Every structure is written in structure tokens, then in C-alpha cells.
Amino acid sequence: MKKIILFLTLLSVGATAQNQSVSFKKNDAEKKIDVLIGGKYFTSYFYPGESVLKKAVLFPILSAKGTTITRGYPIAPRAGERTDHPHHVGMWLNYEDVNGYDYWNNSTAIVKSLQSHKMGTIFHDAVLSTKSNKSTGELVVTATWVDDDGKGQKVLSEKTTYVFSGTSDTRTVDRITTLTAISDLVVFKDVKDGMFAIRLARQLEIPSNKPDVFTDAHGVETKVPVLDNTGVSGDYISSEGIKGEAVWSTRATWMNLTGVMDNHPINVAIFDHPSNVSYPSYWHARGYGLFAVNPLGAKVFSNGKDVRNLTLKKGESVTFRYRTLIADKNMSKSELDLMQSKFAKEVK
């Protein structure tokens, strides 16, 4: 009898961890591609154009249980959430200083203090392919980075592969982005704001009882006010064991955000890859909901002890690889270490 019970327990665990099918639903009218896992909506590759967003994003992002883990503002605002940094939308990849142009802070609602910046825009070009099997789905897209707020020179060509997977209680996204220089010389200046990021729901912020002021590389300040902390439960922990706000500017192979939404645990973990520039990367993870990894911001994060300007000559490329896990449960350090190891082996 004990053997039967043990067998059934193992069978149950195996079923829970089994990958579900991934499918895609194209919506040309709304300029998005919906991603479904196990028949349930997960996210959309959203490319509405520069009149709405200055880059394509994954938005919104839901957990396996249907909990929305991304902030709604400015696309679909929800009551009680912050309305700072309108360029923080869903999940994205861009950078603050490429040949002197700011791709990170660009939006349709640039605050007055940023209006002197020279902005850049990332244009969605094409969906190259979508394909699925029983356990994963792959979406391949291209884009072009253009300076002078999208009216100037083509600077970089982008090819991004998204790989989606999920189980009954997890969702996983791999983003592999290759940037190739179109200009004769492309310089990613060592600055704070970049590179791969998610803007999280209010409930996943770290509770705070004081206002904050954040300053960018140009000395521009952004004020983040105090809000009601009811239901706010977020906290960070890094692969190195550092917790809370202290993770900002530290280096780690992975970073996990823990919290509670809809009365159950939510974990959102981002994994760096050994082949990435500056591995293990610096983390630009803030308590107010910005969860970012920036391999090129060494000067700011190390107080000037380290500098990581990246230069590409025409035709040269750089690839960034990140895995994101959204779990409707708490993940242990050993589980996250194992996922990090698997990511390193599975993606080259």
C-alpha cells in the first residue's frame, strides 16, 4: 500500500511539473501576438507603433493562475498603482545611451525634465516566425534602432527570439536578442538605465514609508511618492543572498522577487547567462517596481571603480540572453541555482 501511495505522489508531482503546450494568436488590428500556454492567456508581444510606445514589449504578463504581475500604467491603468516613469511598460530591452541617444526614457509622455534629451526609437519590423511543439513556443521578430526620436539614422538592427514555456504553476520566457551595428560605430556608454527589464504590479513592490528621488546620468530627477502600502509585499533576494533594496547595484547570476498576490505566493526571477557581457551582471532592481539587469552600467554601480563602455563597429554584433520565471509558489535557492545551470546549458 505504501508503494502505491508513493507511486501516486510521484505521479502527481510529475504531472504538476509537466510542460504545457504553447500556441500563438495573431491580431493584426491591435498589433499584437497573444501567447497562450495550456490554452490560457499568458502575454502578448505588443507592437502598437511609436505613437503609443517607442519599442515593442511583452504586455501584460500573467502567472499560470491568471494573476497579472506587470503594472498597467500607462497602457491599461489600474487603481492604486504608481504613475511614474511612463516608459516602464511590461517586459522590454533597451538602453539609455547609444551614440548619445536615449532609448530607455523615450515615451509619448516625456516629463518636462527629460525633454532636453536626444531620444531614440525602436521600430518593430517583422515577425519572422512562430512555431510550437508540445512543450515550448518560439517567436522570432526583428526591429531597428533609429536615432533622433525615430526620424534620424538607423543605428542597430535587432533580431529577438522569445521562447515560451509553462507548467500548471509556472511560466518561463527566454529572450535572446542580437544587436548588429548599422552605423560605422555604435557606442553603448556606461550608464545606469538599461538593459532588460520588467515593471511590476504595485503589490510586488517593496513596502516604503518615504518618498524617493532618483537621478539619471544627465542629472535629471524623478520623484516617486509614498503610496498606501496595503497589500504590498515584494522583496528581492539575489543568488548571493543579498535582500531587499540592498540588491541594487550588486552583481548576481540571478535575482528573485517574492511577494503575495491574489492570496498566493508569486515569485518572479530573472537569470543572467554566462555568455552575456559582464557576467555576472549588475542589477538595477528598485523597490518601486522596476526590476532590471544592466550589464553595461558598471561605472555607476561600482562608484567609478569599473567602467564597461561597449563599442561595435559596422557589422559587429552583441547578444543578450535572459530567462524570466514567473511562479505561483515560492522558489528555493537550490531550485533557482538549478534553473540557472539549466539556462546556461540550454541556451548558447
Task: Name what the model sees in each region.
Residues 143-149, 162-166, 179-183, 200-204, ...:
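Beta-strand elements of well-folded, non-transmembrane domains
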Residues 85-169:
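Extended, loop-rich substrate-binding clefts of extracytoplasmic carbohydrate-active enzymes
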Residues 1-20:
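Bacterial Sec-dependent N-terminal signal peptides
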Residues 18-86, 176, 191, 329-331, ...:
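Beta-strand-rich N-terminal accessory domains
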Residues 191-277:
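Active-site/ligand-binding surface loops and adjacent short beta/alpha elements
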